[in-house]
Amino acid sequence: MIHQIRIYEIFENNKAAFHSRFRDHASRIMRSYGFDIIAMWEGKTGHRTEFVYLLAWPDEQTMHRAWERFRADEDWNKIKRLTKARHGDLVGTIEDRMLIPTSYSPAISRRRLDQH
């Protein structure tokens, strides 16, 4: 099992549109391709607003295949075009990291995340 963390710069002027798109469309389409979204957060770093989410994958190959299929999805690409035309860019820079647990790391579980 590996994890992936994605950090998106989002903009205050259209943050609500970003969250609507991710909640109502992106996460739904992602799940249809096997994405296992563990948790999602919003945070601030200085003046930058960020949307951060954690994914679980069985292996790196599965992760790459799922992302390829998601990015090629016709519904997703149509939604991106429509929301960009209506609200402008919803995402600035994107950081993407694959996380491989150390031998001494406690296991991540949804229950443990819910307790924090």
Predicted feature locations:
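Sequence-level motif detector for i,i+2 pairs with an aromatic at +2
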Residues: 1, 5, 91-94
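Accessory recognition modules or surfaces
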Residues: 2-3, 7-9, 19, 42, ...
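An amphipathic, aromatic/His-enriched active-site/gating alpha helix that lines ligand/cofactor pockets
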Residues: 17-38, 58-99, 116
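A short acidic, often aromatic-flanked loop/helix-cap motif at beta-alpha or helix-coil junctions
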Residues: 102-106
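C-terminal/domain-terminus segments
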Residues: 109-116
